[in-house]
Design a protein with these regions (language model features):
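Acidic catalytic patch
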Residues: 165, 199-204
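Hydrophobic C-terminal alpha-helix "anchor/cap" residues
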Residues: 60, 193-194
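A short His-aromatic
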Residues: 136-137
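Short glycine-dipeptide loop
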Residues: 153-159
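Generic structural signal for conserved hydrophobic packing positions in ordered secondary structure
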Residues: 56, 133, 198-200
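Short, glycine-/aromatic-enriched active-site segment of Class I SAM-dependent methyltransferases
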Residues: 161-182
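Conserved N-terminal segment of class I S-adenosyl-L-methionine
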Residues: 1-123, 127, 140-147, 152, ...
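A short beta-strand submotif of the Rossmann-like class I SAM-dependent methyltransferase core
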Residues: 127-133
């Protein structure tokens, strides 16, 4: 039997902990316009996006070095950095990279304004992640994209790709539909990734729920690849 009464009667300690938070973050943080719009107008979508990163975080080890391709305004990379050794986030959008740098104070995250195809980092990463990126590329460019990602992956590393399913396209926002060049059926995505990794494991996602149910009923896919070719 746990007596919860012994834990909740120290108001002085509680107030000290609250004050410590306000001292550490006196001005809070200013989110990017994209996230501000989600919070004010579609907060469910904001939490679904975070749930995608939660799933990826569960795949990480504390010793992992992670490259996030398409890190945007940085929330996801900061999320992952709380579950691994270090995260390098890259994005071609300089405005979003500056937004990420503006809110981040974590020492184990770096943000770089860089095109993946021009990335010259010599180190290899334990995990390479790209969520909501491949659907913005043509099929030909997607091949180059996966090849570039695996070139930065350690031999025993893990590649994680997340993307909306083609079956979700009619229900996507106007912004998403305007920018999604190629959405995938799961077997198609598995075949594509199988050209670059030895083994793949697929998951489906609806709202915050990740599962292995019928892929045509899923709104989102994760494919995890192991053993680069």
């Amino acid at each position: 039997m746990i007596d919860t009464g012994i834990y909740n009667d120290n108001q002085e300690e509680y107030q000290k902990l609250v004050n410590d938070i306000y001292k550490k973050y006196p001005n809070g943080i200013t989110l990017s316009p994209e996230y501000a719009q989600l919070i004010q107008e579609n907060i469910l979508r904001f939490f679904i996006r975070l749930a995608r990163y939660k799933f990826v975080a569960k795949m990480l080890k504390r010793s992992d070095s992670v490259l996030e391709v398409g890190s945007g305004s940085g929330i996801g990379s900061m999320f992952l950095s709380q579950h691994c050794k270090h995260v390098t986030g890259i994005d071609v959008k300089t405005t979003e990279v500056e937004e990420a740098k503006g809110i981040n104070i974590r020492e184990n995250v770096d943000f770089i304004a860089q095109d993946l195809f021009e990335l010259t980092l010599e180190k290899k990463f334990d995990v390479v992640v790209s969520l909501d990126v491949i659907e913005h590329l043509s099929e030909q460019k997607a091949h180059q994209f996966l090849g570039a990602q695996t070139s930065h992956l350690a031999d025993a590393g893990m590649l994680i790709v997340g993307t909306p399913s083609i079956y979700s396209y009619p229900y996507q926002s106007a912004l998403s539909q305007a920018s999604h060049v190629k959405c995938y059926d799961l077997p198609e995505l598995l075949e594509l990734m199988g050209k670059y990794v030895q083994r793949t494991i697929a998951f489906s996602m609806n709202d915050e729920l990740v599962h292995t149910g019928h892929h045509k009923m899923a709104w989102y896919y994760f494919v995890i690849g192991f053993g680069k070719k």
